[in-house]
Curated annotation (Swiss-Prot):
Gene that produces this protein: pan
Free-text domain note: Consists of three main regions, an N-terminal coiled-coil domain that may assist in substrate recognition, an interdomain involved in PAN hexamerization, and a C-terminal ATPase domain of the AAA type.
Oligomer and partners: Homohexamer. The hexameric complex has a two-ring architecture resembling a top hat that caps the 20S proteasome core at one or both ends. Upon ATP-binding, the C-terminus of PAN interacts with the alpha-rings of the proteasome core by binding to the intersubunit pockets.
Protein's name in the database: Proteasome-activating nucleotidase
Recorded GO CC terms: cytoplasm; proteasome-activating nucleotidase complex
Species the sequence originates in: Methanoculleus marisnigri (strain ATCC 35101 / DSM 1498 / JR1)
Amino acid sequence: MGDIARQAPDKDTGEDIYQYLLERITNLENRNLELREQFRQMESEKRYVETQKIRYERELRKLKSEIEQLRSPPLVIGTVTDVIDNSRVIVRSSAGPRFLVRTSQLIDPDLLKPGVRCTLNQQSLAIVDVLPTSYDAQIYGMELVESPEETYENIGGLEPQIEEIREAVELPLTKPQLFEKVGISPPKGVLLYGPPGTGKTLLARAVAHQTNAHFLRVVGSELVQKYIGEGARLVRELFDLAKQRAPSIIFIDEIDAIGAHRNDSTTSGDREVQRTLMQLLAEMDGFDNRGDVKIVAATNRIDILDRALLRPGRFDRMIEIPLPDHQGRLAILKIHTQYMNIGEDVNLSEVSRLTEGKNGADLRAICMEAGMFAIRMERDAVNSEDFMKAIDKLALDFDRHHFHTTFGEMFA
């Protein structure tokens, strides 16, 4: 019995040790898991820090490179006048003299052509880089960046004219294969002519909205410059930019400013306008192919345009924009009143009948004046009386302007 009593505590002690070791192992395993998780987190943070370090080092090198570039001396602008071989070129510096210089091996020899602008090292005058073609700032201002909001739906009474201009301008740019199948060349240019206010410029803006081509617009008077050769240079640069941006459309508004009949005038101003016109004729249908560049021009004085400008090959299609008839005026009135709050007593057909001989600009002014009469009377809607007053007011303003114009002509 004594031996059994002595062995019992040993059994209890063994179980306690077993439980203790089991708990200890469990704690160690949990601790191991925690340490593993911490290790993974630290590895992830380490990779993130290394990535950030690489990024900051890259930015540091970039900033150092920019600082070095800013510290480097400026380069001289020159123009290539002749190419001797792949390593030697004759250039004319901006100061005037010409030099035979070396070219960098990093420059493509095909880019070095006579007339190309380049940068020269100040010390050795070696060609460092080739610059893109430079244009007058006025030329870049002619490029339309944002597409106009006007669409063909905003033009009333000109359905045949819209169809013609779409065939001549849009179709060659969007579906050139149709002309290839038939075996004809698409029209090169379109001339819009007609009385003022009939929608010539509006039609051109709709073309710019409808096509994805680059659109360059210029007023004819902008090409008339003070110094000899400046107008011709603007015309040449305008067409060069259009060729680079091809497919493109050039819209020349009021082309009669430079396209009038050539005569024997001896004034320097008239001779400069004629030089600009001759440059325009050469660009429109000269020795060089114009490429995928379409021309749209507008004028209200087709009778004074030079005959050389009107021949086929320059303007293959001349579209007359006439004064609207009754149905055309009604369509224009519906367009201008679609967002107006008009009363039930307004008869647009009657308004169209009373405005015979008016153009689209006059009809827009009538709608605006009718709205102003309604605002003056503190009404929310425009009634028929407002339209009648607007028609009378527009007619009175026209008669007063005509009287002053005639009076000035009589007693000038």
